[in-house]
């Protein structure tokens, strides 16, 4: 899949229009659909539509440092990248490329067994990234133990389990 060079976007809508033009329809629909029946996605959209920033609340703030400490790391902002599976649908090196944005050790990122790039590949190209590893327990006990050992071997700061998806979704 050949995608035009990605531009800087000012809005989510601009990024969405770009993606819709440049990604295969089935892949774009999958990206937009949300898990299972889309309940969480739709609720999140509704909640975000009700969120308002009141400028007077931020009036007079001169120091906008938002860095914080979490899990023993000083990070540049309290935002953490949640794991997203199947990124290779959108870029041939998927999670490896995403992790590059976290290689400066100022932000936390989670990746998961639902990705198509191995933890080994992600870490090989991103030695300094602060990475957490999420395990979907679809495999047997031996496989899960291997994933835990790999997370330790590749110096993940955290290991977590996705326990609400112990069976594969009916949508895929």
Please name every model-derived segment.
Residues 79-82, 107-111, 131-135, 159:
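Hydrophobic faces of well-ordered beta-strands that scaffold small-molecule active sites
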Residues 86, 100, 125, 141-172:
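Alpha/beta enzyme core
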Residues 94-132:
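A glycine-rich phosphate/pyrophosphate-binding beta-strand-loop-alpha-helix module
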């Amino acid at each position: 899949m050949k995608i035009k060079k990605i531009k800087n976007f000012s809005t989510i809508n601009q990024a969405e229009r770009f993606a819709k033009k440049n990604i295969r329809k089935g892949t774009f629909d999958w990206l937009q659909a949300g898990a299972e029946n889309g309940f969480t996605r739709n609720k999140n959209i509704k909640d975000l539509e009700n969120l308002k920033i009141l400028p007077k609340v931020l009036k007079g703030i001169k120091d906008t440092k938002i860095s914080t400490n979490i899990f023993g790391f000083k990070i540049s902002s309290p935002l953490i990248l949640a794991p997203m599976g199947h990124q290779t649908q959108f870029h041939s090196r998927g999670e490896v490329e995403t992790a590059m944005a976290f290689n400066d050790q100022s932000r936390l990122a989670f990746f998961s067994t639902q990705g198509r790039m191995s933890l080994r590949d992600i870490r090989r190209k991103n030695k300094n990234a602060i990475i957490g590893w999420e395990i979907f327990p679809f495999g047997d006990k031996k496989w899960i133990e291997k994933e835990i050992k790999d997370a330790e071997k590749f110096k993940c700061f955290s290991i977590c389990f996705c326990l609400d998806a112990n069976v594969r979704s009916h949508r895929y």
